[in-house]
Amino acid sequence: METLTFKAFRAVDDPSMCAEFLKQHRKVLEDFGITNVTTNNEDWTTDPDTYVIVALSNNNGMVGGIRVEVDRGTRDLPIHSALYELDHRIAPALTALREHGNGEVCGLWNSNKYASLGLPAMLAFAAVSLGNQIGLRSMVCLVAHYTLRHALKSGFTILEDIGNGGTFTYPIPSIKAIAMVIPDVIALSTAPQEHRRHMMSLRLRPEQERIEVLGRVPTRCVYQLCIDKKVLDLRAYVEVLCMHHQHVATA
């Protein structure tokens, strides 16, 4: 049985892993004919507020990845860099979210060998589950139309006040990009119940193993989502549990 390990780390703590992430992500973009993405740069690799999750196969090495970039107001989020010239309204929208703790889920990719197996959704779930560890209340993302379903599963909703109802032609004419937000990453009330349970499980037990079916193949999935392997603040867990019980009671 194949083993997939989902490993989270601060970007500055593992330069070699970041370099491999960049290499594989660019290869996937080139396969789609995309070479001019403004946000496909190396700036994030030296940002202490960028967190990375990679999917590592015991058979095939790094097969997917995703990032969470926390908005401290010192460096533009990728979504700002991508959309500001298309619609200046992205700036005040992000400023309003930053006050309570906001970050961007970005840089999602998976190798072609793992296409249509559900890996993007698994990476997105893992990324969203990090919210409590890194002090976020909201998360934003910019997704291509063909990955919209993964964002919706994770609880993202469309930022309809910018662009054409949240939609932009970016980065090439054949791709529609959608700006999205999870307004409350702690409660995750915008996520479908089945997927919300999964993300809450990863949040409450960030170090776990489970058998999941990718395509039709059972796969051993090992989650290593504790940043720095530190002891997590149990007060955050208590808050998550209370909100979970409240949500169940009112569902």
Describe the residue ranges of each PLM region.
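Terminal substrate-recognition subdomain of acyl/acetyltransferases
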Residues: 1-35, 43-46, 108, 112, ...
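A short helix-loop-beta-strand connector motif used in the catalytic cores of GNAT acetyltransferases and
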Residues: 44-54, 73-77
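Active-site beta-strand termini and strand-to-loop segments that position acidic
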Residues: 55-58, 182
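A structural signal for short, well-ordered beta-strand segments and their strand-loop junctions
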Residues: 62-65, 104, 138-142
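Conserved acyl-donor/pantetheine-binding loop and adjacent beta-alpha core of acyl/acetyltransferases
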Residues: 67-111, 171
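Conserved acetyl-CoA-binding loop-helix of GNAT-fold acetyltransferases
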Residues: 115-129
